């Protein structure tokens, strides 16, 4: 797999679990002999939801909820077959969405 690049994009609601998953991926890739660029923090998506607290009236009484999606990007340059096999067997924490592009 010479002159190839694997781009891994991670998404999670909690930044601590996201950083642990990114550290596991980087450690696995470097242990198998591939070059790693990252983890690069991407902009955090912020969704804001405003709802009325009361069921029927009192529109002035509202509550706001926020949901943040943290993202990281990892590039693995010149991966070997050993790197790909190790990444496929890697156990990541639940709650982390992984997108892989070759």
Curated annotation (Swiss-Prot):
One of its GO terms (molecular function) is tRNA binding. It holds the Pfam family Ribosomal_S10. InterPro entries: Ribosomal_uS10, Ribosomal_uS10_CS, Ribosomal_uS10_dom, Ribosomal_uS10_dom_sf. PROSITE patterns: RIBOSOMAL_S10 (PS00361). One of its GO terms (cellular component) is ribonucleoprotein complex. It comes from the Bacteria. Gene3D superfamilies: Ribosomal protein S10 domain (3.30.70.600). Involved in the binding of tRNA to the ribosomes. Belongs to the universal ribosomal protein uS10 family. This is Small ribosomal subunit protein uS10. It comes from Streptococcus sanguinis (strain SK36).
């Amino acid at each position: 797999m010479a002159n190839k690049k694997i781009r891994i994009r991670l998404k999670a609601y909690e930044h601590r679990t996201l950083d642990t998953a990114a550290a596991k991926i980087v450690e696995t890739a470097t242990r198998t002999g591939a070059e790693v660029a990252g983890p690069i923090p991407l902009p955090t998506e912020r969704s804001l939801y405003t709802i009325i607290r009361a069921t029927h009236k009192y529109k002035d009484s509202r509550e706001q909820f926020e949901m943040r999606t943290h993202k990281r990007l990892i590039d693995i340059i010149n991966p070997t077959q050993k790197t790909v096999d190790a990444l496929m067997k890697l156990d990541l924490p639940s709650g982390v969405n992984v997108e892989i592009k070759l």
